[in-house]
């Protein structure tokens, strides 16, 4: 059963958004009437929103999982909220959610996308999760130059860039792509150096922790990913020595592989997640 009634205590003590949350960005849960013994925590990426994860959430629910998809503070509202939130807020809301799930379920898995994979790694290094899925992991982002971003952040709070909606992507949230315009206006038509600094913090921590993870881990690289570097995925996967580590490369997939241009690539990504968690 789908519900947008998520535990608000996960956000206690964190940045409180001033802007309204768009419909697509609402946190949601999918819970069985008879409580499942297994749960999965889905974590979206940088300037992302829960609606991007509707497809894997639906399939995981149908496979018997209770599904939890929290919205990260500062995202899905306004650019002002984004720059006022921090990596601490993003990480802590997921940590709070995971702690609760570990107390309530026999097994808990994490499925994360893009920057969410960095949060997933950090959580898996501190908590006992059953499986960890890292889709289009943000190990390296060719356009992100930490030194240059640090310099720009001294002088620029907001750099405008060109953006337009791409109807080729198959978004699965109700009413899609109704919220693309407002999210594009607030997030995707801007570079916020201060927010990127927060992403870099997570990236540094996750890369340091990844080789020491013991959780069974699936890494999914997308051949046409123009945001993160798919060639780095297998290289970094080899650094992990404990537990099962599986790396797959999906042809024709883009960075947004859970609502992709290619239905075949999207299906392959979701199938890989389900098979790994089964």
Where do the PLM segments sit?
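Short alpha-helix in the alpha/beta-hydrolase fold that links the catalytic acid
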Residues: 56, 215, 229-238
């Amino acid at each position: 059963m789908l519900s947008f009634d998520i535990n608000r205590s996960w956000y206690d003590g964190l940045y409180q958004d001033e802007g309204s949350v768009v419909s697509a960005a609402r946190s949601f849960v999918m819970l069985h009437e008879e409580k499942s013994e297994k749960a999965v925590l889905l974590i979206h990426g940088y300037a992302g929103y829960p609606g991007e994860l509707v497809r894997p959430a639906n399939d995981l629910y149908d496979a018997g999982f209770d599904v939890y998809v929290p919205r990260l503070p500062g995202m899905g509202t306004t650019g002002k909220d984004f720059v006022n939130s921090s990596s601490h807020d993003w990480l802590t809301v997921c940590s709070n959610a995971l702690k609760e799930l570990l107390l309530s379920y026999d097994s808990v898995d994490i499925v994360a996308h893009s920057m969410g994979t960095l949060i997933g790694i950090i959580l898996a290094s501190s908590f006992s999760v059953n499986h960890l899925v890292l889709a289009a992991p943000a190990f390296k982002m060719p356009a992100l130059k930490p030194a240059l971003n640090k310099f720009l952040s001294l002088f620029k709070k907001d750099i405008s860039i060109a953006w337009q909606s791409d109807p080729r992507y198959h978004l699965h949230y109700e009413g899609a792509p109704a919220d693309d315009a407002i999210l594009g206006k607030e997030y995707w038509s801007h570079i916020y150096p201060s927010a990127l600094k927060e992403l870099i913090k997570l990236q540094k921590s996750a890369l340091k922790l990844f080789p020491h993870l013991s959780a069974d881990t699936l890494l999914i690289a997308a051949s046409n990913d123009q945001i993160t570097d798919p060639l780095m995925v297998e290289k970094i996967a080899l650094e992990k020595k404990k537990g099962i580590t599986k790396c797959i490369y999906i042809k024709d997939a883009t960075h947004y592989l859970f609502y992709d241009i290619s239905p075949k690539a999207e299906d392959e990504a979701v199938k890989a997640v389900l098979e790994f968690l089964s």
